[in-house]
């Protein structure tokens, strides 16, 4: 494959959302661009931020395999940080495939988004078959993308790649497949979560919707009440806060700018449009 056209024609940034790594660009990439750049930069996905007629910006999320994700919690927070700093905003709205999401930019260490959905489609499932040592009881939830949450007593003993790949392609969740979250409850309000991500086809250092899914299921099965607050730690050891207030559910955590292409003058004053 030749040198990617996106590297020479477009500006892009490298972001991390609590360990979830992304390339962010302001124009729609080709499939070739996504595959090349995600492999070249060893990131989890590509965030395309464009102008929107109904929000401050529009976000399209590409997985590292080139497929489009309907939602990505950490990617959404990275996009909100980008838009907030481009336009000098605190309150930010982002149009996505799942609708318009509202968020708040306090600082790069604290970017919050309202992840509330009208129906989480939560359901406990007994798997038709499992690998040796794997729990049969799992929890399905739609947190913007489909997740299966598996509670374990000791995450250090879980073969995340093997079990994650098995469940991601499990016949019980065909044909779409699922993201898979392995969860250990460390304290009443602290979870450790390792996620195998569909579209990356491997464990990632962090997954926003996976942390959200795990916290929502934990709040139910451990009877934490309607208004709860849970800290979630991922493989990256970054903490994400998931909390519920007055029927709304929020995802809050850090965002980091890792690098930028030489011609990306993203801090230059902008009008309220991209492109």
Swiss-Prot record:
It is found in: Cytoplasm. It comes from the Bacteria. The record marks 147, 197 as: Could be important to modulate the pK values of the two catalytic cysteine residues. Its main location: cytoplasm. It catalyses: (2S,6S)-2,6-diaminopimelate = meso-2,6-diaminopimelate. GO terms for biological process: lysine biosynthetic process via diaminopimelate. Substrate binds at residues 20, 63, 73-74, 179, 197-198, 208-209. Its EC number is 5.1.1.7. Keywords: Amino-acid biosynthesis, Cytoplasm, Isomerase, Lysine biosynthesis. Pathway: Amino-acid biosynthesis; L-lysine biosynthesis via DAP pathway; DL-2,6-diaminopimelate from LL-2,6-diaminopimelate: step 1/1. Gene3D superfamilies: Diaminopimelate Epimerase, Chain A, domain 1. The active site is at residues 72, 207. It holds the Pfam family DAP_epimerase. GO terms for molecular function: diaminopimelate epimerase activity. GO terms for cellular component: cytosol. InterPro entries: DAP_Epimerase, DAP_epimerase_AS, DAP_epimerase_DapF. PROSITE patterns: DAP_EPIMERASE. Belongs to the diaminopimelate epimerase family. PANTHER family: DIAMINOPIMELATE EPIMERASE, DIAMINOPIMELATE EPIMERASE, CHLOROPLASTIC. HAMAP family: DAP_epimerase (MF_00197). Catalyzes the stereoinversion of LL-2,6-diaminopimelate (L,L-DAP) to meso-diaminopimelate (meso-DAP), a precursor of L-lysine and an essential component of the bacterial peptidoglycan. Homodimer. This is Diaminopimelate epimerase. It comes from Chlamydia trachomatis serovar A (strain ATCC VR-571B / DSM 19440 / HAR-13). The lineage of its organism: Bacteria, Pseudomonadati, Chlamydiota, Chlamydiia, Chlamydiales.
